[in-house]
Amino acid sequence: MQDAENVAVPEAAEERAEPGQQQPAAEPPPAEGLLRPAGPGAPEAAGTEASSEEVGIAEAGPESEVRTEPAAEAEAASGPSESPSPPAAEELPGSHAEPPVPAQGEAPGEQARDERSDSRAQAVSEDAGGNEGRAAEAEPRALENGDADEPSFSDPEDFVDDVSEEELLGDVLKDRPQEADGIDSVIVVDNVPQVGPDRLEKLKNVIHKIFSKFGKITNDFYPEEDGKTKGYIFLEYASPAHAVDAVKNADGYKLDKQHTFRVNLFTDFDKYMTISDEWDIPEKQPFKDLGNLRYWLEEAECRDQYSVIFESGDRTSIFWNDVKDPVSIEERARWTETYVRWSPKGTYLATFHQRGIALWGGEKFKQIQRFSHQGVQLIDFSPCERYLVTFSPLMDTQDDPQAIIIWDILTGHKKRGFHCESSAHWPIFKWSHDGKFFARMTLDTLSIYETPSMGLLDKKSLKISGIKDFSWSPGGNIIAFWVPEDKDIPARVTLMQLPTRQEIRVRNLFNVVDCKLHWQKNGDYLCVKVDRTPKGTQGVVTNFEIFRMREKQVPVDVVEMKETIIAFAWEPNGSKFAVLHGEAPRISVSFYHVKNNGKIELIKMFDKQQANTIFWSPQGQFVVLAGLRSMNGALAFVDTSDCTVMNIAEHYMASDVEWDPTGRYVVTSVSWWSHKVDNAYWLWTFQGRLLQKNNKDRFCQLLWRPRPPTLLSQEQIKQIKKDLKKYSKIFEQKDRLSQSKASKELVERRRTMMEDFRKYRKMAQELYMEQKNERLELRGGVDTDELDSNVDDWEEETIEFFVTEEIIPLGNQE
């Protein structure tokens, strides 16, 4: 039978080597390896393929090729079943061999067929021996023609396949039939109201209404004692999957103030009953000292840091911002694979890698935490820096969502995974100002989750038909969303207080095309930019609906503009906003002020501006109007306290503008990602005075390191502003010292060098005088230390220089 095997498989192997057929690979790809059936079938095929090269028979019919279907592999891996197993090498149609000898108890007819099979195998084996010499003679001719034998891909004789079926076919084995005793579909619900017979039917209706959402309920049982229910019930579903879904979604359901359901699977009781009574003391984890993660805030000169990516992303550096030249803190090659991002308070630096995200911090920027998420592309931090949201476009499964994952930054543990719709916009989850809530919008639904449980608020989502967009207030747990018109129902903007879900303001709007929500940084105001088409008119008119959030009943003021709106931006710490409107080349910028009496006043309008973006200083008052990319980098620095243009400049082809956290400096840059030449970043003062031009090879990105909110109260800040003149004298003195610091260091260095030279010269002179007697002895008593010590040895030479005299008249001579 072994000889039969050595003949059968080579025919199939050489059939696969025909032109147009798939050639065998040296090492199969991982996907093919996963589909390779485990057990005796795989090593057996490998062994017979090795023998094909030894025999050298090249006659096989087209039917000898072997293909193992995935379904057959699954059946083979799943163990014994009624369906036949995949054919072995002896059963191949083109091998001229019958199945192996049956075991005891098989049909006699099959034994007869086996005897015929043995005789045929012996004949073929003898024929193979006769052909061995002919194959050896044909080998040189085959090498000359380039027809060499295929390489051997067989496993060695001592090879042991230690890969289990679960590793290879885990996804298939997961769905194989399993024995069930029926209790997998039963759940136990605790904290159910205890009622008597008169209210039992009503309770059953309520329970059925709640739990029938998860599947068909086939049976229920309400235990009673002393004429009342015991406070727990049993429900049986038609499928175990429905029971699992009920536990997942109904556990913690709040029926009323006194009753919150606790739902468990009935099978959980066995699991908890088998817990060992012996408690193993957990191993104490050593404390990992990460150092001072906010050390940069204690810098004596109060300088800020920023990150720079250059050389097309191959190098990343961290710098101190210095007026003269940036001071490098850390520089690493291939620190990130795409880009970097700072956390909201500047504690962590996030770098992107194919396998996940890494967080860095501390004085030496050591790795603080890492999160494994294959193919991650986008991230988002919670405002409190406690949670990290990562997104990967790789496919995820229905049972285990992996597209979006929320992580606990402190522990590094995964909190929850979510699916992601392809039409969503990042960030998909938007956080409340304190990180206690986060929300996402799907079709006709607004889902609000709470931390740290990561579950739905009140265990249910908000059904909002047609919801288009939403946004959290930066100053409180208030969420704003808008809904478009639906037939005769007007569009509306709604402000909702959370977690109570109370609607504190609703604004109806008509003839609406689109809405954009713009919050002021402190949450004092909300501007809803409404594009609408009034009846009887052509074109689009824009209304700015200003909600004054700090006043009773949230009054709304309206500013209407008939020109095209290019950009809108609130002053971060104030009540002014700026609007870019018009069309090139007639672009104007208007500055408005929201007064306490509710009146919105136009402060100033500048015409003929080359700008398409508005960048407010983080501290307010100052603003940069920038014409990025297509507008060739035109810059205008404006002081909105008196609405004066402090300076007009240009950074050709600028693609980005970044204010530092203090509002003292601003950076304009040309990124290699958007423009392939003139890549650099320039540092300006808030007044528009250029300080530095830093050219970096293939510069990509610059990001300032954020600062956490100040610990000072508003009263303390007011007092500091009142005493600013006293502090300004100290700052001016430090500035003068810093300006002369470089010259002082140079003078001090030169003075030190001169002093060292004088010491060395004195030491050399002393040594020279000590060696004078030795010199006299070596030179026969002749003193050569002085030039006039031996006049007889002098030679006098006279050198003449020819000097010509030329007279050049100066001025006019009459």
Curated annotation (Swiss-Prot):
GO process annotations (BP): formation of cytoplasmic translation initiation complex; IRES-dependent viral translational initiation; regulation of translational initiation; translational initiation; viral translational termination-reinitiation
Organism of origin: Homo sapiens (Human)
Subunit structure: Component of the eukaryotic translation initiation factor 3 (eIF-3) complex, which is composed of 13 subunits: EIF3A, EIF3B, EIF3C, EIF3D, EIF3E, EIF3F, EIF3G, EIF3H, EIF3I, EIF3J, EIF3K, EIF3L and EIF3M. The eIF-3 complex appears to include 3 stable modules: module A is composed of EIF3A, EIF3B, EIF3G and EIF3I; module B is composed of EIF3F, EIF3H, and EIF3M; and module C is composed of EIF3C, EIF3D, EIF3E, EIF3K and EIF3L. EIF3C of module C binds EIF3B of module A and EIF3H of module B, thereby linking the three modules. EIF3J is a labile subunit that binds to the eIF-3 complex via EIF3B.
Alphabetical keyword list: Acetylation, Cytoplasm, Initiation factor, Phosphoprotein, Protein biosynthesis, Repeat, RNA-binding, WD repeat
Free-text note regarding domains: The RRM domain mediates interaction with EIF3J.
Name of the protein in its database record: Eukaryotic translation initiation factor 3 subunit B
Mod. after translation: Phosphorylated. Phosphorylation is enhanced upon serum stimulation.
Protein family according to the UniProt entry: Belongs to the eIF-3 subunit B family.
Pfam name, any one: eIF2A
Annotated positions of the N6-acetyllysine modification: 209, 288, 364
Keyword DNA-binding among UniProt keywords: no
GO annotation, cellular component aspect: cytoplasmic stress granule; cytosol; eukaryotic 43S preinitiation complex; eukaryotic 48S preinitiation complex; eukaryotic translation initiation factor 3 complex; eukaryotic translation initiation factor 3 complex, eIF3m; extracellular exosome; synapse
Function: RNA-binding component of the eukaryotic translation initiation factor 3 (eIF-3) complex, which is required for several steps in the initiation of protein synthesis. The eIF-3 complex associates with the 40S ribosome and facilitates the recruitment of eIF-1, eIF-1A, eIF-2:GTP:methionyl-tRNAi and eIF-5 to form the 43S pre-initiation complex (43S PIC). The eIF-3 complex stimulates mRNA recruitment to the 43S PIC and scanning of the mRNA for AUG recognition.
Region ranges (Disordered): 1-158
Record's keyword annotation contains Transmembrane helix: no
Annotated region described as Sufficient for interaction with EIF3J, given as residue ranges: 170-274
Compartments it resides in: Cytoplasm; Cytoplasm, Stress granule
Modified residues annotated as N-acetylmethionine in this record: 1
WD repeats mapped onto the chain: 285-324, 325-365, 366-425, 426-489, 490-553, 554-598, 599-642, 643-685
InterPro entries: EIF3B, eIF3B_RRM, Nucleotide-bd_a/b_plait_sf, RBD_domain_sf, RRM_dom, TIF_beta_prop-like, WD40/YVTN_repeat-like_dom_sf
Residues recorded with modification Phosphoserine: 78, 81, 83, 85, 119, 125, 152, 154, 164, 239
